[in-house]
């Protein structure tokens, strides 16, 4: 029986990273790939579902659909409820995203949200992102393809390494052709603290009306005290592959007793 993999992303069905992922997966033996991806780019859409308008599947190719006009979470939700009626896929992969998804950026990420939706439905899931070298805006996904194939083979021949409602968040370092990254190794990391700064830009149209563009602040992270290991950001800075276990439970357990005392 073939190993079934559901694929989605947040860059849209025409994205180079998605095509690179599908190509890599189809090179594996006994694997069946189904793609359901947004009809347009949904970067930073978070874990949103579309509840205010209808959605429809549009066939692009064999086992390849775009969802007009849905989010990654919509894609996974509807794929699991309409395509995989009799049995769930063995694995879900969201990506390959163009750009990193590290630290608190995970909460914005449509790529991570695709994996979140998967584990909500008890489907083992991976989110994979390619950290970009902006001197090469098109990106090179060769290393990401190699990594995802290694992970899928390991999972397919063994088991998924995480419990329910946890997914793997994978970030791939840039500069594939550099000496530093040829020997990139997989490193288990924690999610770093992202440093954010206001990067909104005001403009005026020909009628003098104001409008805004939200910019992307450069990757910058704050140190975390009392945490053993290294962060996703530190692994990438060292030219390594970051693999972070992410859980959906956002409860702040360390603060519960303090909160009880405060309430009493």
From Swiss-Prot:
It comes from Sulfurimonas denitrificans (strain ATCC 33889 / DSM 1251). InterPro entries: SurE, SurE-like_Pase/nucleotidase, SurE-like_sf. Its EC number is 3.1.3.5. One of its GO terms (molecular function) is metal ion binding. Binds 1 divalent metal cation per subunit. Belongs to the SurE nucleotidase family. It catalyses: a ribonucleoside 5'-phosphate + H2O = a ribonucleoside + phosphate. GO terms for cellular component: cytoplasm. It is found in: Cytoplasm. Its cofactor is a divalent metal cation. Pfam families: SurE. PANTHER family: 5'-NUCLEOTIDASE SURE (PTHR30457), 5'_3'-NUCLEOTIDASE SURE (PTHR30457:SF12). The keyword Hydrolase applies. Keywords: Cytoplasm, Hydrolase, Metal-binding, Nucleotide-binding. This is 5'-nucleotidase SurE. Its main location: cytoplasm. A divalent metal cation binds at residues 10-11, 43, 97. Nucleotidase that shows phosphatase activity on nucleoside 5'-monophosphates.
């Amino acid at each position: 029986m073939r190993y079934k993999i559901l694929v989605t992303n947040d860059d849209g069905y025409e994205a180079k990273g998605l095509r690179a992922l599908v190509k890599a997966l189809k090179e594996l033996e006994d694997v069946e790939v189904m793609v359901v991806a947004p009809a347009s780019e949904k970067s930073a859409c978070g874990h949103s579902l579309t509840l205010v308008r209808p959605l429809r599947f549009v066939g692009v190719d064999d086992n390849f659909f775009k969802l007009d006009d849905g989010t990654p979470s919509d894609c996974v939700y509807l794929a699991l409820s309409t395509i995989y009626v009799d049995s769930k896929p063995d694995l879900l992969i969201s990506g390959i995203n163009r750009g990193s998804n590290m630290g608190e950026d995970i909460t914005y990420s449509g790529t991570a949200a695709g994996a979140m939706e998967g584990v909500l439905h008890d489907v083992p899931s991976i989110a994979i992102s390619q950290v970009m070298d902006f001197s090469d805006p098109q990106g090179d996904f060769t290393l990401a393809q190699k990594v995802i194939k290694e992970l899928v083979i390991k999972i397919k021949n063994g088991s998924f390494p995480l419990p329910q409602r946890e997914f793997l968040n994978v970030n791939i370092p840039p500069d594939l052709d550099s000496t530093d990254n040829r020997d990139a190794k997989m490193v288990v990391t924690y999610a770093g603290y992202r440093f954010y700064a206001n990067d909104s830009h005001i403009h005026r149209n020909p009628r003098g009306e104001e409008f805004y563009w939200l910019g992307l602040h450069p990757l910058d992270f704050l140190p975390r005290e009392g945490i053993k290991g290294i962060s996703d950001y530190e692994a990438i800075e060292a030219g390594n592959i970051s693999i972070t276990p992410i859980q959906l439970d956002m409860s702040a357990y360390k603060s519960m007793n303090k909160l009880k005392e405060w309430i009493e």
